[in-house]
């Protein structure tokens, strides 16, 4: 009986020390916080612990999809920390470069573009990354989304595109005969 208890206790302790289980519990907790009206990713308290758990899980998995999942979420956490945007972008690019023929690569590039625009206010680089996404993944749903977002970044300003066209037309009136 003592031996059976020891085996069960050992299995439980191993399960608790599994980095992937810790990461999944963390992701679930962050999701529950977000559903309850909180902002799990914006809450930067304990971000290093969260990042460490996700990186340990990413390093311990053999599956590309799980590795990408943990890396992307850890990058999201990095992006939420003041001064962490460039580290997040680096992580997104690592995923994109490591998985160039998978949808996770496209999602990573899109996330990098959003981070450039939202966190660093660098529309030029965001547009470059979106163009890279369209070139790497032509004809995909992510490419279509990237094109739409790129158009918003290119044409969006204080005035709408139609207002700009109207202003241009009124400034250059046709010559009178």
Model-identified regions with their sequence ranges:
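C-terminal motif of bacterial Sec signal peptides marking the signal peptidase cleavage site
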Residues: 14-15
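Start-of-helix signal in alpha-solenoid helical-repeat scaffolds, especially tetratricopeptide repeats
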Residues: 23, 66-69, 89, 106, ...
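Specific register positions within alpha-helical solenoid repeats of the TPR/Sel1-like families, i.e.
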Residues: 31-38, 76-79, 114-117, 151, ...
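Alpha-solenoid helical repeat scaffolds
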Residues: 52-55, 93, 131, 151
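Short solvent-exposed coil/turn linkers within tandem alpha-helical repeat scaffolds
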Residues: 57-67, 96-105, 120, 134-147, ...
């Amino acid at each position: 009986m003592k031996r059976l208890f020891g085996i069960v206790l050992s299995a439980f302790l191993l399960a608790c020390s599994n980095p992937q289980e810790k990461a999944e519990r963390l992701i679930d907790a962050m999701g529950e916080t977000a559903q309850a009206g909180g902002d799990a990713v914006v809450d930067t308290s304990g971000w290093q612990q969260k990042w460490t758990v996700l990186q340990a899980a990413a390093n311990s998995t053999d599956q590309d999809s799980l590795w990408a999942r943990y890396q992307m979420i850890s990058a999201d956490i990095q992006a939420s920390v003041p001064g962490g945007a460039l580290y997040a972008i680096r992580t997104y690019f690592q995923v994109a470069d490591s998985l160039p023929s998978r949808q996770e690569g496209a999602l990573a590039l899109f996330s990098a573009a959003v981070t450039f625009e939202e966190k660093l206010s660098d529309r030029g680089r965001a547009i470059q990354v979106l163009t890279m996404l369209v070139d790497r993944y032509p004809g995909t749903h992510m490419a279509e989304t990237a094109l739409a977002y790129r158009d918003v970044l290119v044409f969006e300003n204080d005035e709408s595109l139609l207002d700009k066209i109207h202003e241009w037309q009124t400034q250059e009136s046709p010559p009178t005969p």
